[in-house]
Amino acid sequence: LATIIETRDLSKSFKNVDAVSGLSFSILKGDVYGFLGQNGAGKSTTMRMLLGLIYPNSGQIFINGTEFNNSRRYLLQHIGAIIERPDMYGYLSGWKNLEIFAALSRQQIPAARLHAVLEQVGLKGREKDKVKTYSQGMKQRLGIAIALVHEPDLLILDEPTNGLDPQGIADMRELIVSLSREHGKTVLVSSHLLHEIEQVATRMLVIHKGKKIVEGAVKDLLHPDETLVEVVIMKDATIAGKLAGTQWQQHLQASTDTGLTFKLNSKYIPELSKWLVMNGAGIMEIRTKHSLEDYFLSLTNDEVTKHRTV
């Protein structure tokens, strides 16, 4: 599949504080690409760099194979985005808002296209109502319609379910999936809520303190035959090094002086335990974790040092 966006060693700091550090990832055509991280992890900063709203201190961004800095205005024609809550004219109708923002795109956009995007986002029949009468979920959907009017290749959504009620959240999930499956859009969607990403994304990136922790297909990260095995050991700074070159190294997800986290089939736990004991590890406890939430928490532990791409 074609690569829509690629970043290489992207870094950004504010007043000597690293917001994003050496971030490299790629988004493929047709992906619903989940961008997952705790609040303050660097998600919004990265998205702003992708849109040219702020500039990286170092690193490169490529859109459809072309470096962003070389053709910024042209490349932005291929991207639609909502960063935080979209600003709209509440005293005007949804249709009038759509017309105004379509005009700002500097493209000739026919009325038929405006009708089409309203249909896509589920606002057909409400376009004549004033925006101030819309629910928050409807405003978000109108924002997406505005982002879609110029038929972009990529749609960037920053925390699109924030502030929505349960029905609004469900509607937004359904819309994101529909835009990908039925309308062929590539979507980059960020969230600090793991279960939101799990339900819509095909591929995902976990970011923590501005650094990539793991990237891969959601189905691979959620492999049903594998589980997380957390081994609590007596303090030993050498055990992780002993894993190098062994069959267990490829399964290691995270390591500290007092704990190791592996991702593997549970049937191998006895064999792993035997190897650890034979190599001097004082095992205090072995715990298994099955949920993606536990996986996320283990990956974003402050002491995680191992970065991995699936």
Kindly label every feature range from the protein language model.
Residues T227-L299:
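Short, charged/small-residue-rich alpha-helical element at the C-terminal edge
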Residues E303-V310:
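Short, charged, intrinsically disordered terminal tails
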Residues E67, H192, G216, K235, ...:
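Short beta->alpha linker loops
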Residues K219-H223:
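Short acidic-hydrophobic catalytic motif
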Residues A2-T7, K12-V189, L194-H208, V214:
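ABC transporter nucleotide-binding domains
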Residues R106, G184, W248-Q249, N301:
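Residue-level recognition of short, structured coil/turn motifs
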Residues L1, D225:
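Exposed loop/turn and edge beta-strand positions of beta-sandwich/beta-sheet ligand-binding modules
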